[in-house]
């Protein structure tokens, strides 16, 4: 994941049950100027907030899109405590993204003991 125009807060959350870092997150600011990139491994939830008026992303995936494998957690889960750097009143979400469960309520997550790259 990288940003070629604008400014984005990129977030990854460990959703591997049994992981010593389960439920913890990391954030990194990606901009066209800082040239940072972020790798989101399997077993991590990914989200972002656009911090500029507009942004253009480039990203690479290790597999084809598979909607049947898609899952998500709600962006503002208080147990995770992400500072999105955007006032909640200014957040724009799709209808779909408004209905996601919290991490504790999420039905199917990754298992830390499984190698998802094998």
Locate predicted features.
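Active-site region of the double-stranded beta-helix
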Residues: 1-32, 51-118
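Beta-rich strand-turn-strand
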Residues: 30-39, 44-49
């Amino acid at each position: 994941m990288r940003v070629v125009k604008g400014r984005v807060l990129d977030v990854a959350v460990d959703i591997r049950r049994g992981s010593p870092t389960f439920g913890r997150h990391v954030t990194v600011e990606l901009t066209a100027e800082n040239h940072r990139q972020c790798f989101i491994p399997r077993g991590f939830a990914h989200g972002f907030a656009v911090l500029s008026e507009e942004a253009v992303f480039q990203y690479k995936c290790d597999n084809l899109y598979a909607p049947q494998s898609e899952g998500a957690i709600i962006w503002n889960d208080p147990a995770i405590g992400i500072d999105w750097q955007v006032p909640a009143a200014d957040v724009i979400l799709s209808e779909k993204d408004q209905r996601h469960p919290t991490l504790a309520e999420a039905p199917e997550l990754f298992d830390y003991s499984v190698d998802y790259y094998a």
